[in-house]
Amino acid sequence: MDTPPPTTPRTEPTDADVEAFKQQLGRPPRGLRAIAHRCPCGQPDVVETAPRLPDGTPFPTLYYLTCPKANSAIGTLEANGVMKEMTERLAADPELAAAYRAAHEDYIRRRDEIEELRNFPSAGGMPDRVKCLHVLVAHSLAAGPGVNPLGDEALAMLPQWWRKGPCVTPPGDEPATSKEDDR
């Protein structure tokens, strides 16, 4: 797969971004801080969330993948045993394990720059195992290539989820309806 091109790093969410998020996940955002990556279609596909939700609940997932097309494709990888295979490789390959630990440290550093969550792990199983490819891919998209080796690897396995168009209808692009359509 050709990976999505890098986009302007971390942008403030617009009203249209918040609406896209609501359409993507079927709920309003919680703890939304920024758009961490945009899909080639222009919609947000990774958001940066606060380390604590508005009610104070710790939320260790800094980068949250929002695109339902990407989420579905990653779910297929998970169902096909990719996480188990990656975890086995971590145990057998010290260089991969060291690079994955560095990805974990990067994730924690970025989260702690916002607010330190003591005694909370990073996400996705880092640094010792692979528990959630969604988190690893979100980290790779937000941080860029070369930071999370297993996120980069999973991203390379994905089809071009954006190729057939946006996962949601951008605000203002809804198809026009006539009075006949309303009957």
Where are the predicted features?
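Preference for intrinsically disordered or flexible, low-complexity segments
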Residues: D2-R183
